[in-house]
Each structure stands twice: as structure tokens, then as C-alpha cells.
From Swiss-Prot:
HAMAP family: Asna1_Get3. Its main location: cytoplasm. Zn(2+) binds at C273, C276. It is found in: Cytoplasm; Endoplasmic reticulum. It comes from Mycosarcoma maydis. The active site is at D61. Disulfide bonds: none annotated. GO terms for biological process: tail-anchored membrane protein insertion into ER membrane. Keywords: ATP-binding, Cytoplasm, Endoplasmic reticulum, Hydrolase, Metal-binding, Nucleotide-binding, Transport, Zinc. Pfam families: ArsA_ATPase. NCBIfam families: GET3_arsA_TRC40. InterPro entries: Anion-transp_ATPase-like_dom (IPR025723), ATPase_ArsA/GET3 (IPR016300), ATPase_ArsA/GET3_euk (IPR027542), P-loop_NTPase (IPR027417). This is ATPase GET3. The lineage of its organism: Eukaryota, Fungi, Dikarya, Basidiomycota, Ustilaginomycotina. The keyword Transport applies.
């Protein structure tokens, strides 16, 4: 199939479909490091704020670039983005969330704290997954219309998306085990003169966490409620990583039907910049491959490399328009 034919049949090259889908609750933005994920997630959140009642943008990347992008300090509590009434942002770290949970349990009573710690490190990945569960409980209680996740680079993203099923299995196992061993552990604790909350408190906490995770897991697999926007640049490694990401998302049953390709060069025809022309040729090659592979099933959005950094609310607002109105390069 020629690339001209593919382009003819291609889906609309914008993210308008995401803005129109009012049932969406969770939006993930992810890809390889350095491809413009944060700029894309900020731009998407800005566009969503025009059509949805309330939008929350969350960074789960330990590098936390949201503060840099908007030029405003964000932390682990949702804060309104300057210049917006209905857009808030927060930067969280699943690893620190589990540590806080253990410390909180320690302060309530030694036995519960140490058991939480044992649980957290007994199964690989459960520490991060439990941190994720705490975050999701917090986020769900905030009642935003739509939540956009600016995720960590690809490997972390995929681990993050597997947390619900990892945690669901682990907590189900621990809940069952806890109910059989609970009375015996309680007796043992009282023999040692241990005070603090009983094991039932801990298992009730785990159970409530499991319920949240089960619900979130169901929502993540529902294309009416969740979708993933893949971000890449027109280079071999990035395209390869995007294909891997799409395959993994499919295996997790998470909907994905949009690719944002950033940093595209559009040199003027009479440009004397040989480097620009050579690079444009390379980019055209990979954009062609991308169109051939994905244009029938994905909305492919081509975003330009601008002469200035996209930082600050005004520049992000301008840049975000290209997500809904395709960029038209100057003809001269």
C-alpha cells in the first residue's frame, strides 16, 4: 500500500476525538524519555480545560517537569495552575507515598507499621503498587471530571499500568492469609504485651485499598473511560519504542488510538541550512513509516519544532492549539 493511499484513508490528524469523548476519566501520556511528553500532557490538559468542568494534571515522573513547564511550583497537593479556573496540577512519587504510609502506620502502633513494611517488600513491585493505590484513593476522592497523567519514561509507565493487577493479586492473597492467621497473630501480640491497633485494622485498610484498585483496574480497561496517548519523535529508536508501548498497552487491554509526533522540522524551501534539510529527509522517512503502520487506526498528530522553548502558560496555550488545528508550515 502506498503512503499516499494510507494518508488518504488516515484518521483525522488531531486529538479532537479525545476532547469530544466526554466519558473519558483517565488519560495517560507516555513515551521514550526526551520526546516531549510533559509539553504534550500540559497542552492536552489545557485543551481539555476548555471543554471539561475540571481537569487534574498529575506527574508520576520522579523528574517532575510540570513545575518547569508552567513556571510554577507544584507539589503533592493539587494546586490551581495560574491563569486557569478549572485546571489543577500535582507532582507525586509512588515510592514516597508508600514510605509515608509505613511511617503513618508506625506512628499508630508498631505492629501494624512493621506488618505494612513486610507486606510492602514481600513481593517485587508491591511497594510501588501500594504507593500507587494510596495515590488513586487520594485522586478518586477529589472528584475531577478528567485526570491526565504525565507518566515517567516508557519502562516506568508500563510498570505503573501493571500496578492494579499486581496489587489486586497480592492484596487478595494477603487478605486471605491475614484472615486465617489474624486471631493467632492477635494472641501473639497480646502475649508480648503489644499495644496499638489490632490486625483487623490492617486488613480492613488492605481490603479498602484492594477495592479501590479493583475499581480503577476495571476503569483502566474500559475504552469509554481510559485512553493512552503515545508520544514520539521521528527517529528509529523512538518509533521502535512506540511500537513496543502499543503492544504492551494492548496486552494490558488499555485503549490507545493517538500518537503525537513532536519536534518536526519544516525548513523553508530556500533554506541554506544543510543540516536542517538532511534531518528533514530523515524525519520524513520515519513519519512515512509511522503513517504506513498506524494511520488507519491512530490519530497521528504532527507537532513542529519551534525556534523557542515551549515554557510558560502563554506558550503552552499557543502550542496546545496544534493538537486540534494541524500546524501549517509557512510557505515562504
Amino acid at each position: 500500500m502506498s503512503s499516499a493511499a494510507v494518508v488518504e484513508d488516515a484518521l483525522e490528524p488531531t486529538l479532537q476525538n479525545i476532547l469530544d469523548q466526554k466519558t473519558l476519566k483517565w488519560l495517560f501520556v507516555g513515551g521514550k524519555g526526551g520526546v516531549g511528553k510533559t509539553t504534550t500532557s500540559c497542552s492536552l490538559a489545557i485543551q481539555l480545560s476548555k471543554v471539561r468542568e475540571s481537569v487534574l494534571l498529575i506527574s508520576t515522573d520522579p523528574a517532575h517537569n510540570l513545575s518547569d513547564a508552567f513556571g510554577q511550583k507544584f507539589g503533592k497537593e493539587a494546586t490551581k495552575v495560574n491563569g486557569f479556573d478549572n485546571l489543577s496540577a500535582m507532582e507525586i512519587d509512588p515510592n514516597s507515598s508508600i514510605q509515608e504510609m509505613i511511617e503513618q502506620s508506625d506512628s499508630q502502633g508498631g505492629a501494624m507499621g512493621s506488618m505494612m513494611q513486610d507486606l510492602a517488600f514481600a513481593i517485587p513491585g508491591v511497594d510501588e503498587a501500594m504507593g500507587f493505590a494510596e495515590i488513586m484513593k487520594h485522586v478518586k476522592s477529589m472528584e475531577y471530571s478528567v485526570i491526565v497523567f504525565d507518566t515517567a519514561p516508557t519502562g516506568h509507565t508500563l510498570r505503573f499500568l501493571s500496578f492494579p493487577s499486581v496489587l489486586e493479586k497480592a492484596l487478595a492473597k494477603f487478605s486471605t492469609l491475614g484472615r486465617s492467621l489474624g486471631p493467632m497473630l492477635g494472641q501473639f501480640q497480646s502475649m508480648l504485651g503489644g499495644g496499638g491497633p489490632n490486625q483487623e485494622d490492617m486488613f480492613a485498610k488492605l481490603e479498602s485499598m484492594r477495592e479501590v484498585i479493583t475499581e480503577v483496574n476495571t476503569q483502566f480497561k474500559d475504552p469509554e473511560k481510559t485512553t493512552f496517548v503515545c508520544v514520539c519523535i521521528a527517529e528509529f529508536l523512538s518509533l521502535y519504542e512506540t511500537e513496543r508501548l502499543i503492544q504492551e498497552l494492548t496486552s494490558y487491554e488499555i485503549d490507545t488510538h493517538a500518537i503525537v509526533c513532536n519536534q518536526l522540522l519544516y525548513p523553508k524551501k530556500d533554506s541554506n541550512c544543510q543540516h536542517c534539510r538532511v534531518r528533514k529527509q530523515m524525519q520524513d522517512k520515519y513519519v512515512g513509516e509511522m503513517m504506513e503502520l498506524y494511520a488507519d487506526d491512530f490519530h497521528i498528530v504532527k507537532m513542529p519544532l519551534l525556534t523557542e522553548e515551549v515554557r510558560g502558560t502563554d506558550k503552552l496555550k499557543d502550542f496546545s492549539n496544534f493538537l486540534v488545528t494541524p500546524y501549517v508550515p509557512p510557505t515562504e
